[in-house]
Amino acid sequence: SLLNPNLNANMKSVIVIGSGFAGLSSATFLAKSGYDVTVLEKNDSLGGRARVWESEGFKFDMGPSWYWMPDVFERYFKSFGYEVSELYELVRLDPSYRVVFGPNEHEDQSANMAELEAMFDRLDPGSSKRLRKFLAEAAYKYEVGIKDLVHKPSRSLLEFADLRIIKGLFQLDLLKNMRKHVAEVSTHPKLKAIMEFPVLFLGALPQNTPALYSLMNYADMSLGTWYPKGGMHKIIEAMVKVAKEQGVKFRTETEVKGFQYSGKKIVGVLTKTGGFSADIVVAGADYYHIDQEVSDKDRREYSKQYWD
């Protein structure tokens, strides 16, 4: 976790590849810890997938369209002395979204829990009671999974030697998969599709995903779907503001094409316009892109077949 980067600030210079959420977050926390940070972005504007495209007076989000888990953003901005409300205005969407099953066949996901439960009971009488139990368990998983596990640096198992965490592991459903867990609420095909849907954000299949990730259903159904007025780029604008206040420097239209090495250590990056040396290089771009297109062939972690 870069919330408490336990790094040696004597290693002063840092290059961050990419100005998406991950790159900006890394850059701001490292700069706050005393590093000299430069972000390199290949596009002509900042934001990575969350950049904005403007044409004929219209603005279009180029990537994310939903704002989930608002507490994560609140935690980030509070680390730099800001409330989210000082930087952009959030609106909770109702319905959260529409699930389309076919021509003239859809279900709206209400932001109102009573209406959501009524929809479950309409499709599968009695299922709302099981949904409440499911979400109560998911809320616990969210509390432990996000607040006690995700925000730890994961450098040592000793970080997790906490009685609350150890006790909590037995309630996280690590040995059950999401498909079976969802079936405990309902086997109705539409409800199963609605409840399994958030797992897709993990790039996984429900049958291969631990039931721990029902915490995503809690994020969806209980915490809600939000949208920043003015578009997703408002978040990027806020993060760039914070980054610049911390002293982060930005270079757009600077695509990283390769790494500079000294033995096994990366000591810089190569671009079309020249090289940039750094004590630390943080890759905020896609894993595939870094592994297959930026790293030298003999230094790639995975084969092309693995990615295919």
Residue ranges and their predicted role:
Residues 252-266:
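A conserved short coil-to-beta-strand element within the FAD-binding core of flavoproteins
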Residues 102-210:
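Rossmann-like flavin
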Residues 1-10:
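N-terminal amphipathic/basic-hydrophobic helices that include classical n-h-c signal peptides
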Residues 12-143:
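N-terminal glycine-rich phosphate/pyrophosphate-binding loop and immediately adjacent elements
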Residues 225, 229-238, 245, 259, ...:
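Glycine-rich loop(s) and the adjacent beta-strand/alpha-helix scaffold that form part
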Residues 169-178, 221-241:
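Short beta-strand to alpha-helix junction loop
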Residues 13, 267, 279:
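Conserved acidic residues
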